[in-house]
A protein has these predicted regions:
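Feature marks short, surface-exposed loop/turn motifs that line or immediately flank catalytic pockets
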Residues: 40, 131-134
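Internal alpha/beta core interface subdomains
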Residues: 177-178
């Protein structure tokens, strides 16, 4: 995993006919990881979408993470899965997907949840929401200092929740290795998505000491 933009899809913003082209736009702009998050569609459609996204992400040499569904991740040979607190256990997901899989864990605003996720083998720790979010308006609010404290786990730290180009810099400075962005990236046409992704990459290039230009951008 590299520091940078973590693009998270949303079926309310991206109808099926736009999903792949929008993700490809984010990848062209420099997204370093993509999460497929779609729970409303029937399983056959989700399977097709996930397979198409795996192909797009593999072409860009960027990991595709499946939200909350280790079985789907295994079926499409995705790079890994992101788990919420009410989803499959880390141990179960690891057993299904193997040691090489990337498994991320939602930690909300809790260092204790992060500690448990770290002990159970999470590959990255996700905190938030940090700002008002239409995607998860009821998620507990997190203070930015939790990003700094979470550095002690020596795992990549991800921030999520209401993130835009106007507020992302402060999260990177506080310790975020990745910014998981939904509406602040995908609410617009493909040209706008690509431009926003490039601007997020610029934030990391300026403010994150370990940022490198993704291979597909060189």
């Amino acid at each position: 995993m590299r520091p940078g933009l973590y693009a998270v899809t949303d079926g309310d913003l991206l109808p099926p006919e736009r999903l792949v082209s929008a993700v490809e736009a984010a990848l062209r702009g420099g997204a370093v990881m993509v999460q497929y998050r779609e729970k409303a569609l029937p399983s056959p459609e989700r399977l097709t979408q996930a397979r198409n996204l795996v192909a797009a992400c593999n072409n860009a040499r960027v990991p595709l993470i499946i939200n909350d569904d280790p079985e789907l991740a295994q079926r499409v040979a995705a790079s890994g899965v992101h788990l919420g607190q009410s989803d499959s256990s880390l141990e179960t997901a690891r057993k299904r997907l193997g040691e090489a899989a990337i498994i991320g864990a939602t930690c909300h605003a809790s260092i204790d949840l992060a500690r448990n996720a770290d002990r159970n083998g999470a590959d990255y720790l996700a905190f938030g929401r940090f700002f008002p979010s239409s995607t998860k308006p009821d998620a507990p609010a997190a203070n930015q200092d939790i990003l700094t404290r979470a550095r002690s786990f020596r795992k990549p730290v991800t921030a999520i929740g209401g993130i835009t180009l106007n507020n992302g810099e402060s999260l990177i400075r506080a310790g975020a290795d990745m910014l998981a962005v939904v509406g602040g990236l995908f609410d617009g046409n493909d040209d706008l998505i690509e431009d926003r992704a490039r601007q997020f990459a610029k934030l990391f290039r300026t403010h994150h000491p370990l940022f490198q230009v993704p291979d597909h951008q060189e």
